[in-house]
Amino acid sequence: GYRITDKAKILENLVYNHLLYKGYDIKVGYYGDKEIDFIGEKNGEKIYIQVALKIDSDKTAEGEFGNLLKIQDNYPKIVVTEDTFSGNSYEGIRHCPIRQFLME
């Protein structure tokens, strides 16, 4: 049978399916040349989400948070990872473990 072994793709699928379950219309977006993994829209509100396995270096953090930092509106921006700690944010962008994200 078919088996996905790419953990990053599995994590993205979890986030995508959770957003669908919550009733969001989902798009992949770009801001300039920067990809935004998911832009969810529901009832006139937006949510921007980047998905990464881990934020284990400044370069990874710069890439994941940097794409969202370029968006100049006041809608929520979240980086979802498989990390287990919670509560961190970076310049107003929330860093959320997947387990916590799925319970919201």
What annotation goes with each model-predicted range?
Residues 1-104:
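A cross-kingdom feature that marks ATP-driven nucleic-acid transaction machinery
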